Amino acid sequence: MKGFLLLSLSLLLVTVGSSSQASSTTSSSGGTSPPTTVQSQSPGSSSQASTTTSSSGGASPPTTVQSQSPGSSSQASTTTSSSGGASPPTTVQSQSPGSSSQASTTTSSSGGASPPTTVQSQSPGSSSQASTTTSSSGGASPPTTVQSQSPGSSSQASTTTSSSGGASPPTTVQSQSPGSSSQVSTTTSSSGGASPPTTVQSQSPGSSSQPGPTQPSGGASSSTVPSGGSTGPSDLCNPNPCKGTASCVKLHSKHFCLCLEGYYYNSSLSSCVKGTTFPGDISMSVSETANLEDENSVGYQELYNSVTDFFETTFNKTDYGQTVIIKVSTAPSRSARSAMRDATKDVSVSVVNIFGADTKETEKSVSSAIETAIKTSGNVKDYVSINLCDHYGCVGNDSSKCQDILQCTCKPGLDRLNPQVPFCVAVTCSQPCNAEEKEQCLKMDNGVMDCVCMPGYQRANGNRKCEECPFGYSGMNCKDQFQLILTIVGTIAGALILILLIAFIVSARSKNKKKDGEEQRLIEDDFHNLRLRQTGFSNLGADNSIFPKVRTGVPSQTPNPYANQRSMPRPDY
């Protein structure tokens, strides 16, 4: 009854705009739980009002619930603690629009020793931190925090989730809305074990700060994947960084701006400027020729850097504008042996050097400057100037007459596909081609379309008819000798194998013959010394004959078998 009267008095004082604080504490019987207080405040009031309620049993800390009406400047929070266990307090805080204080909501489950869990949120226009933390009961897991921030705020926003049990370090997920300037990171840690946290950081467009490093809170390793403002966009040409009519050309890790034919890109003006062109071919030494046709490859970018650096250094004191690479082709090697011996390879690069429209440079002065620079260059070997009329396919030998490329006359067999296209190209073949007669129309290096024979055929002896290539030859105009070389090499290899086989057979037979002769000699010696002692015959008088000679004469002394008594056995009787 006393508590009810105190609560009524507190509400009455708040209603009339009193600035004093009223509180009521009610403690239930049993246990040692601390009191629970509930505080509230009416609009316009500057004092704090609270109500504390403590449940019976256990040793749970107090639970507090605080709230604040619009226009107030004090903190509002709501804390609820369940009975039993030793869980830390749980707090829930919220803030109305226009408030400048912190708002949070904390919920803690009963039992275990889990750290507190906090949930904080902030309305648009506030400048304080907003976070949400959720911690499961039991175990010894560190706190888990989730923070978020509305557009326009300048404080940090993070979200942390930690599972119960084990000794895993905290896991944090941070995000930031467009327009903020604070750090954004996302960290995820699995429950249990002692693995350090893994952090993923990202930054929204428009942010100006870099993601900060994450220090592991335990374990032996950490994994961090940063992304955002420090790495730049993946597509270098999206959005297009080139202004005006220029187009963006993307290389491996850089880009450049390319204008229409006869124009160069002025980076200081950020626009295309009309210029004077000087085409030519240079021969360069490169370490690798693979993927030079691919503009996005590393090899092409290295070649582009070498070419542009060479010409920028050569024409640094002139009104030089830009160098454009037209075509890259591999120069034919002198021999296969020299190609294997040389560490570098030669490539031919067709370029166009563009100067200012009112330049005083001529084709002769440009060639002279390049040849002088080649003497001190390490990778550029040669330069050949190309007549401007030949470059565009126009009639004439004077380059000065072909500067107005849209007004020049195309060569016979060449034509412009569009009046605004500067190049004259072959539209039709120079003569009719018939596929049944093994003919085809191809574009030559000079741009002219010509009717030639198909691969494996050639025009022989001035005959216009395509005939099949002789044995061993193939390809265009029968210039491929692969079959002939293969036939010759195969014949030589077969002959060598046959010679080796014959030599092996002869060697084996000679060894067998030597062995048979030795056996025959041993047999002859054995028969020469043989004596037939059992019959009394001997071959000594047979004149080296293997058959014994029989003696027909009467011997002078007849051998007496009883003469030698020692050789005969005696009877025992």
Curated annotation (Swiss-Prot):
Keywords: Cell membrane, Disulfide bond, EGF-like domain, Glycoprotein, Membrane, Repeat, Secreted, Signal, Transmembrane, Transmembrane helix. Cleaved into two subunits, alpha and beta, probably between the first EGF domain and the SEA domain. Beta subunit contains the cytoplasmic tail and alpha subunit the extracellular tail. The homooligomerization into dimers is dependent on intrachain disulfide bonds. Highly N-glycosylated. Homodimer of beta subunits. Residues 233-273, 385-425, 425-467 form the EGF-like domain. Residues 1-17 form the signal peptide. Glycans are attached at N266, N316, N397. Residues 16-237, 548-573 are annotated as: Disordered. It comes from Mus musculus. Residues 554-567 have a biased composition (Polar residues). The chain crosses the membrane at residues 481-508. Epithelial and hemopoietic transmembrane mucin that may play a role in cell signaling. This is Mucin-13. Disulfide bonds join C237-C248, C242-C257, C259-C272, C389-C402, C394-C408, C410-C424, C429-C441, C433-C451, C453-C466. SMART domains: EGF, SEA.
